[in-house]
UniProtKB/Swiss-Prot annotation:
Source taxonomy: Eukaryota, Amoebozoa, Evosea, Archamoebae, Mastigamoebida
InterPro entries per UniProt: CDK, Kinase-like_dom_sf, Prot_kinase_dom, Protein_kinase_ATP_BS, Ser/Thr_kinase_AS
Organism annotation: Entamoeba histolytica (strain ATCC 30459 / HM-1:IMSS / ABRM)
Keywords tagged on the record: ATP-binding, Cell cycle, Cell division, Kinase, Mitosis, Nucleotide-binding, Phosphoprotein, Serine/threonine-protein kinase, Transferase
Name of the coding gene: CDC2
Protein name according to UniProt: Cyclin-dependent kinase 2
GO terms for MF: ATP binding; cyclin binding; cyclin-dependent protein serine/threonine kinase activity; protein serine kinase activity
Family annotation (CDD domains): STKc_CDK_like
Residues involved in ATP binding: 10-18, 33
């Protein structure tokens, strides 16, 4: 790895340690991830290699670029494009984010997601810390450490995905079969956070997270969400909250509230897709050419 001069540790992601490094061949900064072994004698899991290979094919302006992969001393190194900050850092230093800037950020997130979902890849860990911003201000989806292919329709997945505050209700209720709708819910939570400058559902544990959601959006019933009572962690004793009008939660552009309503639909199959969300009137200023 003499090609890459490590400069500083940036943190630890899903995969392992992340460092800022200088690429001495291409003369640019990169983000270098060193993959953790599950056990010392395991080597690198075949599934990780296979899924990372898929990410090498994910070339899109709003998906972080994976430049290369190296194997050295039984460790796997991923070489990503370097981004200056993440959305969490951006929000932390911004007192108020104008609606036009929010529109641009969410639009780019959805463009990246639509591309991933088209290629049948779920991100499964959408949160501000995993949404990167490069020096040009372009939004990049990052950290695909929990990403999975959905090409096998009846495949069952773990429900232990997505950081708690951004976790979709179907995941919290124990669903093991799910699709891109989980990423849409997470994006809606980020969208709302950009508007209110505060996390929407700050649960301390899974049940508290459910209650935080239900107390704002209402406790789902079979009439609202067909099949909800059959999910593993659903309880008939859940408190019965009524849904609040989203206008009382978000004091912003009417079209933004309407889009949030469609992104926060409980029934996963009815939740708006990333591709359809991009066509929503909220994004008209970005979709319509200037006259």
């Amino acid at each position: 790895m003499t090609r890459y001069e490590k400069k500083q540790q940036l943190g630890e992601g899903t995969y392992g340690v992340v460092c800022k490094a200088w690429d001495t061949v291409c003369n640019r900064y990169v983000a270098l991830k060193k993959i953790k072994q599950e056990r010392e004698d395991d080597g690198i899991p075949v599934t990780s290699v296979r899924e990372i290979a898929v990410l090498l094919e994910l070339k899109h302006p709003n998906v972080v670029d994976l430049y290369d992969i190296y194997l050295e001393d039984k460790f796997l190194y991923l070489v990503f494009e370097f981004c200056d900050e993440d959305l969490y850092q951006f929000m932390s230093r911004s007192s108020k984010i104008p609606i036009n800037e929010t529109r641009s950020i969410v639009y780019q997130i959805l463009q990246g997601l639509a591309f991933c979902h088209y290629h049948q890849i779920l991100h499964r860990d959408m949160k501000p810390q995993n949404i990167l911003i490069n020096k040009n201000g372009t939004i990049k989806l990052g950290d695909f450490g929990l990403a999975r292919l959905t090409t096998i329709n009846d495949r069952k997945y773990t429900s232990e995905v997505v950081t708690l505050w951004y976790r979709a209700p179907e995941i919290l209720l124990g669903a093991t079969q799910y699709g891109g709708a989980i990423d849409i819910w997470s994006t809606a939570a980020i969208f709302g956070e950009l508007i209110n400058k505060e996390e929407l559902f700050k649960g301390r544990c899974k049940i508290d997270q459910l209650f935080k959601i239900f107390s704002q959006l209402g406790t789902p019933t079979e009439d609202i969400w067909n099949g909800v009572t059959k999910l593993p962690f659903y309880l008939s004793t859940f408190p019965k909250w009524k849904a609040k009008d989203l206008h009382t939660i978000f004091h912003t552009d009417e079209r933004a509230v309407d889009l949030l309503q469609k992104m926060f639909i409980y029934t996963p199959e009815k939740r708006i897709s990333a591709a359809d969300a991009l066509k929503h009137p909220f994004f008209d200023p970005l979709n319509k050419p200037n006259n």
